[in-house]
């Protein structure tokens, strides 16, 4: 998932201004400027857009954890140089002190119900036989559910509406392909 999308979504959901965003990065011992934040929050088609790399998003999420949970004793957790959706979800779960039931409820708010076993697969170590990689669509729905929970809105910022529309189109074409495969399988059995 695009890191800039995560930043835009968190900023909108929790109504975080530039000064607060600078403070969140400072919590993770990182200095950023308003100009950097502005460039990271721009849409891709804007000429001033700059992609936020994994390291900067990891630092932001670590700072977000500190903002919500306080600084832990001892050395701070080193930010990951490579992020995936599973790590992003885990960091948000920690920051917001969410239990598995809370995450399931948030996904249900975004019309994406899942079970506990499916959710636990996202938190397993890579390489574990039950580990499952979280797809962009599911993280996008989690972010949408967070917004509904914290802002009480079903409406999304414009860039998010486009993402969800594209997701529905992908799901519909996947369903049609699957239906066609099932129908041809049934047809072949009848012959």
Predicted feature locations:
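A structural feature that tracks compact, well-ordered secondary-structure segments
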Residues: 10, 16-28, 35, 40, ...
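A short, Lys/Arg-rich alpha-helix, primarily the initiator
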Residues: 1-13, 79-92
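Short, surface-exposed loop/turn motifs that are enriched in glycine and acidic residues
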Residues: 46-50, 78, 92-93
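Intrinsic disorder/low-complexity detector
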Residues: 60-85, 152-191
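Acidic (E/D-rich), amphipathic helical modules within compact regulatory domains
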Residues: 19-70
């Amino acid at each position: 998932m695009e890191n800039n999308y995560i930043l835009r979504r968190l900023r909108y959901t929790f109504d975080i201004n530039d000064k607060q965003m600078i403070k969140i990065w400072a919590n993770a011992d990182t200095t950023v400027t308003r100009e950097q934040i502005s460039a990271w929050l721009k849409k891709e088609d804007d000429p001033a857009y700059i992609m936020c790399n994994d390291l900067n998003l990891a630092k932001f999420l670590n700072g977000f954890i500190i903002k919500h949970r306080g600084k832990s004793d001892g050395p701070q957790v080193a930010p990951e140089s490579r992020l995936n959706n599973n790590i992003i979800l885990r960091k948000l779960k920690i920051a917001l002190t969410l239990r598995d039931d809370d995450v399931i409820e948030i996904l249900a708010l975004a019309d994406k119900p899942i079970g506990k076993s499916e959710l636990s697969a996202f938190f397993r170590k890579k390489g574990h036989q039950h580990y499952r990689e979280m797809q962009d669509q599911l993280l996008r729905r989690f972010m949408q559910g967070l917004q509904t929970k914290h802002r009480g809105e079903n409406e999304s910022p414009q860039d998010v509406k486009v993402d969800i529309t594209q997701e529905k189109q992908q799901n519909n074409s996947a369903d049609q392909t699957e239906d066609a495969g099932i129908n041809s399988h049934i047809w072949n059995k009848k012959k």
